[in-house]
Amino acid sequence: MQPYRYHVFACDQQKPEGIPCCSARGSRQVLDALRAEVAAQGLGDQVQVTACGSLGLCERGPNLVIYPEGVWYSGVTPADVPEIVRSHFGGGVPVARLLNRDAAAARAEIAANKQKMQGALRAREAAGALPDELAQAIRGFQESRAILTAIELDAFTAVGGGASAPAAAQAMGTDSRATEMLLNAVAALGLLAKRDGVFHNTPLSARYFAAGSPDDARAATMHTANLWRRWSTLTECVRAGTAVARREPRAPDDQWTEPFIAAMHRNARERAPHVVRAVGTAGVGRMLDVGGGSAAYSIAFAQAGDGLCAEVLDRPEVLAIARRHVEAAGLAGLVTLRAGDLRVDDLGSGFDLVLVSAICHMLGPEENLDLLRRCRQALVPGGRVVVQDFILEADKAAPRMAALFSLNMLVGTEHGASYSENEYAGWLAAAGFQDVTHVRLPGPSGLMVARRAG
């Protein structure tokens, strides 16, 4: 492998309010412009662009340091990027007007800046100001809401290859003034770039949030937008101990089901290879996928197994979506679909493997025990059940995502929650399973695997 010819380090550190920093001066837009221009000029194999912490000279940011020469640029804007790429990376000639030439003065300014920042932090602490990380966590909903609204209104598609706020508003069917405020906020978050009053998608937003991209994640992200409404009832849910009725009418099923299954499919498509490798297909001729959603796991197992047949059990409206994925994979002969209710239905019999993925968190303890007992009845002697879910530590205060997801179940279900390894092991033993094993996988969820006793 050939080393990069140039390494570019761009400061993108966020600092407490009132303290100068490159991120407040548009460093994220500069980073996006650099990456896009390097790619456009075909220099991706020669130039590596990396975001880093504070370089100093914060009042003159955004700052870039370029190696191997150690060239330092200050006050860089997105408009400067084409010249930097063309002259410096393409021609080997640094852009003189952006250079910091006096190294001694720069070092002195960096030292003074450091003292100034430390003094400001001490003053904030003495005044009882919230630590910046805590303040950002409390206000984090603002950034999330701005992005979700942009996706709900299809703003990134409206911006396309470039659009003014009035043009985008016309395409979105929204108010021009409010649209510009929204697009400005999204640009500040780094998902749009704004040049001369015209908004442009960044490589990130064009890839995931604009129509026509092969990695279009809009439908999956709409599931998060739907969850927003549920999470707004969290305070009431904690008082009541369960999900509470929302004040607004529930969206039609197709507006809920499609985004939900799209989100689950996107996640399952990434995780399925890990699950198949961890579980294996040896000795598996028939598999039942309980609440199998888009059939992503059944497809992965059928593709990995030698003649393995999988059956997906789910609601009719979900199976209509699963059918599209099964047919697209060319596996209609190996993956079959069965309409049913996993909460009450007999699951059948004669299966070598039963997969219960992302189901148990929707149910209460008694419901999970009942489901696992029916899974046992569906298995041949010695057959395995595989439960994939968020698995909490014994004290239930970690991992972080599993603990937060438990709240997601509080606001969205009657009895659901995230559960610990000990709870799963207890249910499996009570349901008639043995050889219970916790298999840890990359990512937030793990597997509980057990074998039918007798």
Please identify what each model-predicted range represents.
Residues R5-R25, Q48-P68:
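Local cysteine-cluster metal-coordination motifs and their immediate loop/turn environment
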Residues R5, V284, G382:
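Phosphate-coordination loops involved in phosphoryl transfer and adenosine-cofactor binding
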Residues R124-N184, K194, T281, V290-G454:
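Alpha-helical subdomain
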Residues A24-V49, V71, G75-G90:
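Ferredoxin-type iron-sulfur electron-transfer modules in oxidoreductases and energy-metabolism complexes
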Residues P62, G190, G383:
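Glycine-centered, phosphate/nucleic-acid-interacting loop/turn motifs that mediate DNA/RNA or nucleotide
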Residues V71-R124:
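Fe-S ferredoxin-like electron-transfer domains
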